[in-house]
């Protein structure tokens, strides 16, 4: 599942970004660990003061980007379910967070960047009105602080047709890598048993802007 983001080129029109609100109710978008985008046709974030991961389609424009790297025109933007790492409930983990299987899809949106682990997963969906519950848990092994586990609770909706979901997890509760790149190990229960994958991970660099 280690993947370089296909969105790393600012001139690609569809990208995975972090929508970051700033002090004056405006926002910018973080394209990857080092590239920022200024949306010239949207002054206020559609997600208010929430920081979220999102899929965006944009065109670069030849306008001033101020303190940001590139000015862009947003054609459409769609947020991804964005969650913190879940709390450890001990003996209740299986009951609450579930043990239902998923397959992880190895594509350009499955990536660890900008302090998030974004995942495309596939599972069975029978009742489209039944919400599934997905979470990320930290390892209980103190010697493996960069090990996390994906959990899925289908609430009994385990038959039907395969379909994909997207989720992004904020990794800020993991230990600071202090500028180093480490291996982040993801564990999950697949339809073929327990599986793991590794991602290159570095704690998010501080990027703070107060105005556009």
Spell out what each predicted region is.
Residues 1-7, 11, 209-211:
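Single conserved hydrophobic/aromatic residue that forms the stacking wall/gate
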Residues 13-212:
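First exposed extracellular module after export/assembly in secreted or surface-exposed proteins
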